[in-house]
Amino acid sequence: MDITNIKSIKGFQFNGKETKIGSATTWTDIINENLPSCYDMLKACAKEVGSIQIQNLGTIGGNICNASPAADSIPCLLALDAKLELSSANNQRIIPIDEFILGSRKTKLKQGEILTSIIIPKEKENGSSSFRKIGARKYLVISISMVACRILISNNIIEDISISVGSCSEVAKRIFSIERQLIKKDINEDIFNQVDFSQLNEISPITDIRSTHVYRLKASQLLIKDVVKDAINKQEIAR
């Protein structure tokens, strides 16, 4: 059953406390929408999903519910503290995205439910963001590692930061160990020499046909540095 033409689950809804993204919103819709810079990571992710044809037809809701370990949207939505609105004929419930995906291709969707929207709290729409992924090629590829970062800086101090890694575990993970080291750091100092980027205990990279677990871990460490630097630079330029 194709539900992508249901208007009520397409596009963006903005209000004073949250932003709702309809589950049938396509990647092209996301690319073309005028959004705050905290969504730059989601736009960057959208531009690298599959091919242009897939971006025109594929939806963010489909990417989430497919529950692939390499689902591009999940690290970005984790970094935005997203919640998911699940609806059935008789009920509606909202759960955090980090509770929705149980494992590879496994979700908390019940029989008769569909994902209707993704909810982003207003307080997470501040700051800047960045997204990077690595694979055998740029498009039409299952990633080896991907990283998303959202950062809020005030008076040169990192006030809030979220970092998420995908393709390195059954489920994408927030990297709280690195976030804790970066919070309250002065960006004018050499923060990257003050942080131990090897401490990625939240993920469990595997060896498969695309990569060894050692390469995945090293790639993730480097991508984390890249996205944090990029997000900091974006916010400095915007000031």
Q: What label would you give each PLM region?
A:
Residues M1-R239:
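C-terminal structural segment of proteins
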